[in-house]
Design a protein with these regions (language model features):
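ABC transporter nucleotide-binding domains
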Residues: 1-133
Length: 133
């Protein structure tokens, strides 16, 4: 089963002066267990691609077209509430500058535990530990 399917994804940044085509017609499919490496020069759109799929770009500055499906879910068309049920539970990303996201003074397990508790507030400590370690 295809886990993530991205088809003809385009992301354009707009300002008053010009448009910048950051992601141009990208397509790929990923199955369960697949790994994907995205390689390119600084500023070539790698982070923009991930941020677009995860809907982390402001619609005021970025225009997204194309399709991104997680299983049967159209990531770019679903409501914000529906998407938030998937984010960090079923689909996530660790960006290249993870020090901006993850705290170096806290254990990674504790940080992942916090995210897990948001999605599974009734989970026991044992269940949480089994999931994050």
């Amino acid at each position: 089963m295809t886990l993530l399917s991205v088809k003809n994804l385009n992301i354009t940044y707009k300002n008053k002066e010009k448009e910048v085509y950051a992601v141009d017609d990208i397509s790929f499919d990923m199955e369960s267990g697949d790994s994907l490496g995205i390689v390119g020069e600084s500023g070539s759109g790698k982070s923009t691609l991930a941020m677009g799929i995860l809907r982390l770009l402001s619609p005021k500055t970025a225009q997204i077209s194309g399709n991104a499906f997680f299983k049967e879910n159209d990531l770019l068309a679903m409501s914000k509430d529906e998407f938030n049920k998937l984010r960090w539970k079923h689909i996530s990303v660790v960006f290249q500058k993870s020090m901006n996201t993850l705290s170096p003074i806290h254990k990674i397990g504790d940080q992942l535990e916090d995210i897990y508790k948001v999605h599974e507030p009734k989970a026991t400590k044992e269940q949480i530990k089994g999931r994050v370690l």
